[in-house]
């Protein structure tokens, strides 16, 4: 959430930054006008309360002296009525301010490319060379069925579209991947966490999913619970409402969890395969950092995601998302996209973001600066390390062989009991 004081004191800068994200200046102008009206009413309210206190003292004195206080009482009742009217106006204005400021996106960092959509994203670097196949490549969903390791038909029967069963070496490959990912992140100083798979609405607000993106989630009816769309939500909210010791920062968390997404607005997109599911496993990275260190930590986090792909031998590229393609809470985002041969393109497999103090303000996560003893908002970062199902898809397609088998990447073999290949039955 943006700082209302910042909007008030640096309006033109904030308006210019949010314009790059498609926010009309009229919206900010209305917010500023509401804030000015609210502050004026607060002054009026305080002045009237001072009058009421004086009148109350005069009434008390008149009564002690057995004097008639009828007029003073009438005057005080009028002042009290005026205060109540102003208080009601303040409640209404506060709600309007909240309704606006809670759905304003984060302001982009100055290094973020300006653009409308994914066409304006900027490629930063590539790693690896896509394999030159001398046979016709199969899509991962066909490979999964032919190898009897992925079962979409029964997933649809048991649950519905965009669900599946992993079987046999497919299940072991999925498990091997997330164990490998967690182990790699632990080597880099991340603390492994097992989170709840449900969170409350306050947690969803804290990380920015609520109130704007409710339609993308699965809520449990008649409860305060929501199935997590990503482990970012419980990991970031771990410290919600707390003040951390600045000497402890930065703090790194990692967790593997299922992610549940309604995929509202995705009808007709990626209807086959592992790219877009309602339920999928993902290894998440979350950091809590001092403001002056957060962009260095973003580079490290992105490198942590890249490390997984490099050790798996999967070609990828890193993209800096433009202002029109970034997520709601992000100030800057790098997408890491893995090569998918059957689609002849790169697809997102990790998204690493610095939200600066946007989530920390919503969730009230602060730290005490050891230098001056002051309590300040910290910066939060999050990233996929990686989306496990998409990594399975990338391995199946990039490591497929002409005979229909798939070679298991060398780094995963110790996690799979020494298996080296997944062969057709």
Curated annotation (Swiss-Prot):
InterPro entries: aa-tRNA-synt_IIb, aa-tRNA-synth_II, aa-tRNA-synth_II/BPL/LPL, Ser-tRNA-ligase_type_1, Ser-tRNA-synth_1_N, SerRS_1_N_sf, SerRS_core, tRNA-bd_arm. GO terms for cellular component: cytoplasm. It catalyses: tRNA(Ser) + L-serine + ATP = L-seryl-tRNA(Ser) + AMP + diphosphate + H(+); tRNA(Sec) + L-serine + ATP = L-seryl-tRNA(Sec) + AMP + diphosphate + H(+). It comes from the Bacteria. Its EC number is 6.1.1.11. CDD domains: SerRS_core (cd00770). It is found in: Cytoplasm. ATP binds at residues 261-263, 348-351. Keywords: Aminoacyl-tRNA synthetase, ATP-binding, Cytoplasm, Ligase, Nucleotide-binding, Protein biosynthesis. The keyword Cell membrane does not apply. Pathway: Aminoacyl-tRNA biosynthesis; selenocysteinyl-tRNA(Sec) biosynthesis; L-seryl-tRNA(Sec) from L-serine and tRNA(Sec): step 1/1. It holds the Pfam family Seryl_tRNA_N. One of its GO terms (molecular function) is transferase activity. The keyword Manganese does not apply. L-serine binds at residues 230-232, 284, 384. GO terms for biological process: selenocysteine biosynthetic process; seryl-tRNA aminoacylation. Its main location: cytoplasm. HAMAP family: Ser_tRNA_synth_type1. Consists of two distinct domains, a catalytic core and a N-terminal extension that is involved in tRNA binding. Homodimer. The tRNA molecule binds across the dimer. Catalyzes the attachment of serine to tRNA(Ser). Is also able to aminoacylate tRNA(Sec) with serine, to form the misacylated tRNA L-seryl-tRNA(Sec), which will be further converted into selenocysteinyl-tRNA(Sec). Belongs to the class-II aminoacyl-tRNA synthetase family. Type-1 seryl-tRNA synthetase subfamily. PANTHER family: SERINE--TRNA LIGASE, SERYL-TRNA SYNTHETASE. This is Serine--tRNA ligase. It comes from Streptococcus pyogenes serotype M49 (strain NZ131). The lineage of its organism: Bacteria, Bacillati, Bacillota, Bacilli, Lactobacillales.
């Amino acid at each position: 959430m943006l700082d209302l004081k910042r909007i008030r004191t640096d309006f033109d800068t904030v308006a210019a930054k949010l314009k790059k994200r498609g926010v009309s200046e009229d919206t900010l102008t209305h917010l500023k006008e509401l804030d000015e009206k609210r502050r004026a009413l607060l002054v009026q309210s305080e002045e009237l309360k001072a009058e009421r206190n004086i009148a109350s003292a005069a009434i008390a004195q008149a009564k002690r002296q057995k004097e008639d206080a009828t007029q003073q009482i009438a005057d005080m009742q009028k002042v009290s009525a005026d205060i109540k009217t102003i208080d009601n106006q303040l409640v209404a204005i506060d709600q309007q301010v909240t309704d606006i400021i809670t759905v304003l996106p984060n302001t982009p960092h100055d290094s973020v490319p300006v653009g409308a959509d994914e066409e304006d994203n900027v490629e930063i670097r590539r790693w690896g060379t896509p394999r030159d196949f001398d046979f016709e490549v199969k899509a991962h969903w066909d490979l999964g069925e032919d190898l009897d390791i992925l079962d979409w038909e029964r997933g649809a029967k048991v649950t519905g579209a965009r669900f599946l069963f992993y079987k046999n070496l497919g299940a072991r490959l999925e498990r091997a991947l997330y164990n490998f990912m967690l182990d790699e992140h632990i080597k880099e100083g991340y603390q492994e966490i097992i989170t709840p798979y449900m969170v409350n609405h306050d947690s969803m607000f804290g990380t920015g999913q609520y109130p704007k993106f409710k339609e993308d989630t699965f809520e449990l009816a008649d409860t305060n619970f929501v199935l997590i769309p990503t482990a970012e939500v419980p990991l970031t909210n771990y410290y919600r409402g707390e003040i951390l010791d600045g000497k402890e920062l930065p703090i790194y968390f990692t967790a593997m969890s299922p992610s549940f997404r309604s995929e509202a607005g995705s009808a007709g997109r990626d209807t086959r395969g592992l790219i877009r599911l309602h339920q999928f496993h993902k290894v998440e990275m979350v950091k809590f950092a001092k403001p002056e260190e957060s962009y260095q930590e973003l580079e490290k986090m992105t490198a942590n995601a890249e490390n997984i792909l490099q050790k798996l031998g999967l070609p990828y590229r890193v993209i800096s998302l433009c202002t029109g393609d970034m997520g709601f809470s992000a100030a800057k985002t790098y997408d890491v996209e893995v090569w998918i041969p059957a689609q002849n393109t790169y697809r997102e497999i990790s998204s690493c973001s610095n939200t600066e103090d946007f989530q920390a303000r919503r969730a009230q996560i602060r730290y005490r600066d050891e230098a001056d003893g002051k309590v300040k908002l910290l910066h939060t970062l999050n990233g996929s390390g990686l989306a496990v199902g998409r990594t399975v898809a990338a391995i199946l397609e990039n490591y497929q062989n002409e005979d229909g088998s798939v070679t298991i990447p060398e780094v995963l073999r110790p996690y799979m009991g020494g298996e080296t290949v997944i062969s057709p039955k």
